[in-house]
């Protein structure tokens, strides 16, 4: 047993540890969130408050009091959503820990007076549960303290505040107030057997008898009063449909929850069904009747409505319910239950009749009772009046000036002799302070004022003398006869006689007083003589009246500051507006001048006047105005135009822009004169940008006048000035593409002007003062051409399927000069359309006849500054070149998209073009210049130069190839020493040797002299390849040797004798250097090799027979030169060198006998 107990204790301690840890974790989180609340944004604050509410009130309610102040402090946050979240937190607090009600109820009362209607509605929604939970909590207290009493007082205050909100201006606040009052009525009433039962229901039966804060009877009376207010509100004629439906629903709920009120609710529904508010529209009437039908059906299901079933059934029939539907709604009851309810109905009716009869008797008895003057009440009124008068007099008697004035005023009225009454009542003034004397005199005078019912104390007296029921002594009746004393009878008769005499006397006095009053009334009814104004006044001169008028208006105008300080500036503005709109012209012009003196600060007054003139023009106002012979809109137009001109003349540039824009955008109507003035303003250089933007905004914001403003922009889009044209076209694009305003009209105008270009000379419609071209011109100018197609080109990217076709038609039919103008203007629209435009790609693919130049220009534009052209574009251009357009220029823009083989195939055709085009081609191929530096080619500069050397001269002129190679070699940044070495290395491997190889070698030596050793090696390799068999190359070989002498002399010694003889014959200047070199070689040991005697003889010039293998002297014609097929495996050989497959390689002839003794070239030993 002990082990079990110990284990239980252990489990409890462990649970406490986990609970403490959970609480500590939650506290840490909430502390962090509260710290973040200080600097967080409103949305973040709401999220953090929701987290705090979920953590504190959801799982760790013991932390609620600790962090309550941190959350409640946000009730003063400027953001509405944050304050609503605080209300939600307070509502949840009152549900979870209602004992914290005294701490939060002040915040609820404060937020109920919030400036935001949304916050007020949320507070009213929360007050429903707060009031219910608070009422239950206060009822559960055995000994409520001061905090509980204060909480109940504030709850009562909140209840009163929400009750006042039933007449609030906001519809939503009224609806929420109705729902709250519904809950109050249910809470403050008793439930019975037919009441609808709900979980957590509360009624007056749950209020304990010992509760000292409130009593059942008081709460019940208050609930009944609130129900009466709801019923009264439900029957008002000005109620809105939303409030009416909400009030109907609330009354239905009250009747279901508290059937005791069923009769009043059914009667209210009956009145509503018979008399719907006249302010409702047809749709609202339908909604109200539908809601009323639904609520009546709900009531009929309740057992408490058995007594009123016939009334409800009649209303439902009137609202469209069938008999079967109604019968299904009536709850099922057995016969005993129905009999019991019928009996209760009869008892209630009998009690009602009895009560009505009892009330009628009491009312009749009350009327028959004899009344007498209530002297006690009259004395109390006199005392209260004396106190009020005494206080009033004491305050004034403390002022010496008032006392002195009073004495001096009444001193002459004193009698010559002292009245006897004064002597009787006078008491000598003892030694009293001034304050005591003032009190004494004030009391004395106050009593006199009260006697005469004068002074401020007269308000304490009731209008009628206070009366009370006269008490009559009960006389016991006896069955025995009483003896009557004759003296007593006589005494009684004398008293009765005196009473009659007094009554007669009073009646006579009353009649005399009534007669006097009647005389006064008759005199008052006599009509006084009316005096006519013309009889007693003299008319003022006209000029004087006008001066008085203008002075009065000027004083009103000059009181601007005083009216602002006094808070009546709006009333002053309204007064000035009416005066300006209805008074003669001199007043109008004076007010206009006053406005224009400081138009920036008085623009609101100008707008008020403008709208007043508009109201007069449209007949919206009851004010009259001075009739004139002008048109009805003259005053409005004159005011608007003067305002516009005044702003333009008197304001600086910045204010002018702002105010002109406000006037045109806010004016109720814009006459044609004002629009024309805006057009003239837009011609000003400083205002053109803002003016055209304003015209565009007017076209958007004033739909009835959009045709006029679009027409203005169209005129500006073909204006002679370029800046106006560009601005207008940009705004037309916005209207055309973004706002979709009159796109058909804009298309029509643009195409009409585009077709002007097809004519031989500019038509007359192009020239007008509105377009800035008043003088007609006989011939087309470039500027005029651009004006005609400018708008069409601007709209081309937004509707290419229409404009591109029209532009193509115009391009085909126009002259060459205009075609060039069109081609130069295509850049911007084509770039906006982009390479992925299907319309452009289709045009490139189709390329109608006569459109080749236009298509090529479009391709150029689409490939500008693009690293690699679009694949689809390259494909279309390739197909175009192969199938339709044989002009190689079409391939130039897409060079960077071609493959290596395609580039080599088109290169011979490209270099045959004019020099300017060839220069551009090589700029593209080599990436020269900023325009082409970003392009990537399939061939390197080395490959390009090698490909140029391998071009077949039968296909391309040698001069074109020479120019092309010169263009390449001129780019020293690209063709460096290393690049040229690579080029020459590849060229020497080509068979047959390229014709221009030695020329390129010589140019390379000229550019880079340090290539001499490399060139020497090339020359040796050329001897091996029998360079003398190609005449042009042989000549270049010899020129290279000449440039490299004397270093090149050993190269000559490696030539066969016949070629050495030929070299010395062609270049005699080589002989001395060669002789010198040979002599130097003779002085050295032979070391196994040397110069033969035959060579020495050739060098010395002696006659030596040299045998040549053929009659050509060793030269082979180009058509018989052996060409080796390239081997792809060799890197040094370019795979793209064209091979003449038609030629069969010739066998190399064996060397002659004399050549066998010649030394081999270096490296061939």
Swiss-Prot record:
Pfam families: SYMPK_PTA1_N (PF11935), Symplekin_C (PF12295). Disruption phenotype: RNAi-mediated knockdown results in overproliferation of testicular cystocytes undergoing transit amplification leading to increased incidence of spermatogonial tumors. The keyword ATP-binding does not apply. InterPro entries: ARM-like (IPR011989), ARM-type_fold (IPR016024), Symplekin/Pta1 (IPR021850), Symplekin/Pta1_N (IPR032460), Symplekin_C (IPR022075). One of its GO terms (cellular component) is tricellular tight junction. Residues 367-384 have a biased composition (Basic and acidic residues). HEAT repeats lie at residues 23-58, 61-95, 98-140, 147-186, 218-257. The keyword Glycosyltransferase does not apply. It comes from the Eukaryota. Residues 365-384 are annotated as: Disordered. The HEAT repeats have been determined based on 3D-structure analysis and are not detected by sequence-based prediction programs. Interacts with Cpsf73 and Cpsf100 forming a core cleavage factor required for both polyadenylated and histone mRNA processing. Interacts with Slbp and Lsm11. Belongs to the Symplekin family. This is Symplekin. It comes from Drosophila melanogaster (Fruit fly).
């Amino acid at each position: 047993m002990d082990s079990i107990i110990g284990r239980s204790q252990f489990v409890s301690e462990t649970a406490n540890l986990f609970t403490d840890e959970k609480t500590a974790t939650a506290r840490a989180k909430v502390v962090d969130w509260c710290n973040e609340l200080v600097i967080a944004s409103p949305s973040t604050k709401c999220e953090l408050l929701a987290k705090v509410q979920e953590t504190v009130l959801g799982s760790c309610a013991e932390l609620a009091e600790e962090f309550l102040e941190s959350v409640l402090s946000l009730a003063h946050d400027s953001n509405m959503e944050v304050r609503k979240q605080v209300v939600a937190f307070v509502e949840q607090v009152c549900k979870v820990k209602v004992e914290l009600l005294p701490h939060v109820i002040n915040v609820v009362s404060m937020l109920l007076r919030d400036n935001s209607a949304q916050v007020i509605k949320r507070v009213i929604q929360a007050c429903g549960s707060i009031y219910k939970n608070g009422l239950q909590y206060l009822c559960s207290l055995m000994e409520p303290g001061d905090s509980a009493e204060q909480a109940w007082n504030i709850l009562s205050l909140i209840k009163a505040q929400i009750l006042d909100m039933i007449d609030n201006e906001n519809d939503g606040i009224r609806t929420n107030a109705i729902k709250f009052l519904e809950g109050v009525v249910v809470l403050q009433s008793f439930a019975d057997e037919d009441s609808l039962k709900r979980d957590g229901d509360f009624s007056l039966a749950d209020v304990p008898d010992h509760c000292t804060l409130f009593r059942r009877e008081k709460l019940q009376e208050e609930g009944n009063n609130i129900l009466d207010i709801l019923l009264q509100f439900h029957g008002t004629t000005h109620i809105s449909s939303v409030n009416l439906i909400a009030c109907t629903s609330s009354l239905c709920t009250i009747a279901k929850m508290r059937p005791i009120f069923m009769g009043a609710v059914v009667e209210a529904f009956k009145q509503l069904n018979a008399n719907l508010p006249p302010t409702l529209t047809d749709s609202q009437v339908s909604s109200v009747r539908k809601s009323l039908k639904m609520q009546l059906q709900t009531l009929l299901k309740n057992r408490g409505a058995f007594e009123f079933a016939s009334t409800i059934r009649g209303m439902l029939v009137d609202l469209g319910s069938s008999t079967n539907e109604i019968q299904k709604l009536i709850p099922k009851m057995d016969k005993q239950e129905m009999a019991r309810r019928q009996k209760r109905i009869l008892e209630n009716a009998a009690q009602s009749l009895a009560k009505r009869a009892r009330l009628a008797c009491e009312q009749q008895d009350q009327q028959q009772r004899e009344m007498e003057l209530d002297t006690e009440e009259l004395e109390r009124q006199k005392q209260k009046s004396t106190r009020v008068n005494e206080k009033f007099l004491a305050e004034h008697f403390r002022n010496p000036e008032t006392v002195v004035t009073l004495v001096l005023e009444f001193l002459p009225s004193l009698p010559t002799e002292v009245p006897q009454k004064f002597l009787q009542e006078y008491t000598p003034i003892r030694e009293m302070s001034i304050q005591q004397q003032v009190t004494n005199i004030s009391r004395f005078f106050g009593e006199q004022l009260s006697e005469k019912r004068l002074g401020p104390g007269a308000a304490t007296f009731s209008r009628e003398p206070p009366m009370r029921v006269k008490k009559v002594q009960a006389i016991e009746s006896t069955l025995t006869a009483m003896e009557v004393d004759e003296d007593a009878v006589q005494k009684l008769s004398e008293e009765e006689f005196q009473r009659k005499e007094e009554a007669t006397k009073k009646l006579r006095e009353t009649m005399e007083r009534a007669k006097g009053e009647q005389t006064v009334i008759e005199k008052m009814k006599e009509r006084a003589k009316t005096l006519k104004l013309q009889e007693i006044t003299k008319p003022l001169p006209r000029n004087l009246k006008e001066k008085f008028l203008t002075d009065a208006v000027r004083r009103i105008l000059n009181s601007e500051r005083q009216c602002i300080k006094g808070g009546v500036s709006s009333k002053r503005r309204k007064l000035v507006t009416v005066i300006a709109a209805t008074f003669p012209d001199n007043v109008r012009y004076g007010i206009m001048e006053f406005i224009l003196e400081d138009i920036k600060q008085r623009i609101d007054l100008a707008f008020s006047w403008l709208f007043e003139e508009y109201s007069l023009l449209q007949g919206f106002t009851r004010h009259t105005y001075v009739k004139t012979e002008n048109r009805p809109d003259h005053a409005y137009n004159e005011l608007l135009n003067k305002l516009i001109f005044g702003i333009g003349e008197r304001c600086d540039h910045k204010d002018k822009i702002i105010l002109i824009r406000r006037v045109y955008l806010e004016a109720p109507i814009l006459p044609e004169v004002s629009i024309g003035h805006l057009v003239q303003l837009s011609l000003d250089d400083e205002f053109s940008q803002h003016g055209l933007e304003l015209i565009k905004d007017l076209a958007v914001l004033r739909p009835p006048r959009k045709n006029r403003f679009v027409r203005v922009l169209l005129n500006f889009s073909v204006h002679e000035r370029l800046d106006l044209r560009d601005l207008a076209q940009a705004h037309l694009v916005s209207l055309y593409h973004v706002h979709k305003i009159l796109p058909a009209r804009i298309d029509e105008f643009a195409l009409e002007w585009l077709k002007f270009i097809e004519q031989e000379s500019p038509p007359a419609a192009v020239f007008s003062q509105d377009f800035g071209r008043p003088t007609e011109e006989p011939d087309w100018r470039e500027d005029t051409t651009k004006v005609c197609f400018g708008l069409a080109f601007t709209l081309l990217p937004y509707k290419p399927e229409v404009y591109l076709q029209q532009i193509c038609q115009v391009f085909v039919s126009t002259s060459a000069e205009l075609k060039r103008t069109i081609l130069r203007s295509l850049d911007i629209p084509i770039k906006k359309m982009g390479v992925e435009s299907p319309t452009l790609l289709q045009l490139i693919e189709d390329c109608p006849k006569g459109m080749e130049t236009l298509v090529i220009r479009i391709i150029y534009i689409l490939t500008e500054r693009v690293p690699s052209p679009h694949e689809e574009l390259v494909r279309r251009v390739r197909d175009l070149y192969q199938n339709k357009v044989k002009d190689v220029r079409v391939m130039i823009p897409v060079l960077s998209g071609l493959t290596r083989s395609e580039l080599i195939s088109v290169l011979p055709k490209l270099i045959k073009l004019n020099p300017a085009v060839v220069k551009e081609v090589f700029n593209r191929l080599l990436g020269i210049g900023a325009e082409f530096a970003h392009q990537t080619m399939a061939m390197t500069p080395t490959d390009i130069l090698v490909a140029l050397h391998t071009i077949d001269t039968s296909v391309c002129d040698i001069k074109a190839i020479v120019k092309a190679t010169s263009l390449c070699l001129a780019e020293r940044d690209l063709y460096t020493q290393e690049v040229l070495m690579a080029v020459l290395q590849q060229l020497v491997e080509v068979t047959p040797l390229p014709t221009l190889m030695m020329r390129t070698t010589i140019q390379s030596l000229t550019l880079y002299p340090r290539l001499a050793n490399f060139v020497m090696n090339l020359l040796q390799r050329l001897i091996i390849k029998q360079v003398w068999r190609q005449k042009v190359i042989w000549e270049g070989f010899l020129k290279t040797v000449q440039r490299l002498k004397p270093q090149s002399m050993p190269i000559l010694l490696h030539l066969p004798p016949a070629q050495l003889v030929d070299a010395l014959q062609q270049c005699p200047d080589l002989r001395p250097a060669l002789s010198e070199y040979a002599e130097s070689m003779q002085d050295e040991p032979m070391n196994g090799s040397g110069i033969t005697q035959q060579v020495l003889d050739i060098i010395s010039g002696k006659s030596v027979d040299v045998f040549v293998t053929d009659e050509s002297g060793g030269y082979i014609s180009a058509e018989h030169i052996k060409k080796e097929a390239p081997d792809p495996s060799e890197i040094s050989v370019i795979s793209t060198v064209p091979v003449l497959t038609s030629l069969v390689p010739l066998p190399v002839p064996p060397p002659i006998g004399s050549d066998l003794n010649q030394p081999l070239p270096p490296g061939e030993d």
